Amino acid sequence: MSYAIFKHGGKQYKVVEGDIVLLDKMNKEPKALVELVEVLAVSKEGKLSCGKPFVNGAKIEVEVINEGRAKKVITFKKRRRKDSKTKRGFRRDFTRVRITKIVA
């Protein structure tokens, strides 16, 4: 089983071909093909190649499925005896992609 570890938006993801992953918003149209080149490690046929920091010549080809927004996350802070409270909401924008090919 071959897999790859790549970096996108300050996070690292471990994927195999055919996986569906939620990445940070990329502003691409659905069915667009995108290449991700910040590949940290690739394992093919049991051989692991790690980069310093990235693997030379490695890339991951992905197909954009859609874009959307996640459910709202509420943060609530209350300071006791101070009659003070704060309520905030945050919705993450994401791009759903399918891993089509891992090139190493």
Swiss-Prot record:
Name the InterPro entries for this protein. Answer: bL21-like (IPR028909), bL21-like_sf (IPR036164), Ribosomal_bL21 (IPR001787), Ribosomal_bL21_CS (IPR018258)
Task: Provide one Gene Ontology cellular component.
Answer: ribosome
Q: Tell me, what is an example of a GO biological process annotation in this record?
A: translation
Matching PROSITE patterns:
RIBOSOMAL_L21
The molecular function terms of the Gene Ontology recorded here are: rRNA binding; structural constituent of ribosome
Query: Highest taxon of the source?
Result: Bacteria
Keywords assigned: Ribonucleoprotein, Ribosomal protein, RNA-binding, rRNA-binding
Any single Pfam family the record assigns to this protein = Ribosomal_L21p
HAMAP family, sorted: Ribosomal_bL21 (MF_01363)
Q: Which family does it belong to?
A: Belongs to the bacterial ribosomal protein bL21 family.
Q: How does it assemble?
A: Part of the 50S ribosomal subunit. Contacts protein L20.
Describe its function: This protein binds to 23S rRNA in the presence of protein L20.
Protein name (database record):
Large ribosomal subunit protein bL21
Source species of the chain: Helicobacter acinonychis (strain Sheeba)
**Upper classification of the organism:** Bacteria, Pseudomonadati, Campylobacterota, Epsilonproteobacteria, Campylobacterales
Q: Which gene encodes it?
A: rplU
